[in-house]
């Protein structure tokens, strides 16, 4: 989709691993918009501290990742707010921590969202499970019909499904 509001820059970060079945959901989602839209798109195996600097140049970031959590619709789009968290591993940094680092280090307030898509299989395989593929298609439709138009309109805060009720 073209015609996005270039005054409000948005980056989509696809998180996952395309060699581990449903863990590829984030990357496959990013693939869909890498060439066909004005969204900036990047891929990550996992989030890194350096991503705080990257997203500081944007107004909005959408983190897309597979999830083991069961969801009624097979996907969930929700706001992500900056929050400091402490982990005893450098291999686990969540989106809220990245947003917090962006605000603390770069004094940048970036609107953040998490788009989680339910997955079921995580073994070494380059194919989505049948259920995850269905959720993926539903998530794409939702994103194209509800999220992209809001971004294109320059909406400063995208309403999540729970906020519409």
Task: Name each region found by the language model.
Residues 1-119, 126-138, 142-165:
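N-terminal catalytic or cofactor-binding beta/alpha core of small enzyme domains
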